């Protein structure tokens, strides 16, 4: 049976920024909202692949953050973006979904954590390749990102080459850091997914988030995994979807691992199986 043609919807945030969003209808009361990483868009292949895979388990809403893709405004690198996520979550409620989870990648992970900790209204939260703190420059990739957003030439290149419009104003007030926000998410279930080959944020960021958070929480350190959307193979996407489905069931107080690790695997590590070419960052 052929799926219906997907059409985009324009949602408007409380500060009047138009947000380009799409909805892949599900067959249950569960919706997964995808929050993409910096310089990406719901139309980019890695994001679209994950959206379609999640759609086998749940309804899916994905969108472009401000300053990205077909949305308006300028990117504030995670500060005002919680308003973007808020309008999409509200839209999911309007569509009739009773269980709503947000899955964020990299920058999107920091936004999902801050939204869940400061605003609330989610039934489960997943952070994939997210930072534990701001201003991290400990890797070459993150030093490049800082040059791209802090310098005028960097912002120009980012706009023209990566189709991402970054605000030149910076943060007037430093937003609540991701780890501090993670501490406020309980009793909503939280899953932290991170690769041990992440070239942007090393695993210490995932551990920082996990240590700050309260139960119920889980940490999956994935051997061989790199960074964010491009590093998520089909097996991992399916495992996250199963965790979300179990975590949001009303009769289950504490979610269990969708695929528990074997006896030779540490309790906070989940082995990677059947890696695909998509696993390259």
Kindly give the residue locations of the regions a language model identified:
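N-terminal cap/lid segment of alpha/beta-hydrolase-fold proteins
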Residues: 1-26
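Conserved alpha/beta-hydrolase
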Residues: 51-72
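Conserved alpha/beta-hydrolase "acid-adjacent" motif
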Residues: 199-205
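Primarily recognizes the serine-hydrolase "nucleophile elbow" in alpha/beta-hydrolase
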Residues: 91-146
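Short beta-strand/loop motif that positions the catalytic acidic residue
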Residues: 185-186, 192-194
């Amino acid at each position: 049976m052929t799926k219906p043609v997907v059409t985009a919807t324009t949602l408007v945030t409380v500060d009047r920024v138009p947000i380009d969003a799409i909805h892949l209808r599900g067959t249950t009361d569960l919706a997964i909202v995808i929050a993409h990483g910096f310089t990406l868009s719901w139309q980019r292949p890695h994001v679209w692949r994950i959206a379609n895979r999640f759609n086998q388990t749940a309804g899916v809403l994905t969108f472009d953050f401000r300053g990205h893709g077909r949305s308006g405004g300028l990117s504030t690198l995670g500060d005002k973006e919680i308003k973007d996520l808020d309008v999409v979550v509200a839209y999911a409620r309007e569509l009739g979904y009773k269980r709503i989870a947000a899955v964020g990648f990299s920058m999107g992970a920091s936004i999902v954590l801050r939204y869940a900790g400061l605003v609330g209204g989610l039934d489960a939260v997943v952070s994939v390749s997210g930072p534990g703190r701001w201003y991290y420059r400990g890797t070459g990739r993150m030093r490049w990102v800082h040059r791209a957003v802090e310098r005028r030439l960097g912002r120009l290149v980012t706009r023209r080459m990566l189709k991402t419009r970054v605000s030149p104003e910076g943060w007037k007030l430093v937003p609540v850091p991701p780890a501090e926000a993670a501490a406020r998410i309980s009793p909503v279930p939280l899953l932290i997914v991170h690769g041990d080959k992440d070239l942007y944020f090393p695993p210490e960021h995932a551990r920082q988030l996990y240590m700050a958070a309260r139960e119920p929480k889980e940490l999956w350190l994935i051997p061989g995994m790199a960074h964010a959307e491009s590093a998520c193979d089909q097996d991992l996407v399916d495992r996250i979807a199963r965790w979300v489905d179990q975590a949001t069931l009303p009769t289950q107080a504490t979610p269990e691992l969708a695929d528990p690790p074997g006896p030779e695997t540490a309790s906070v590590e989940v082995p990677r199986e059947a890696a695909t070419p998509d696993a390259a960052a």
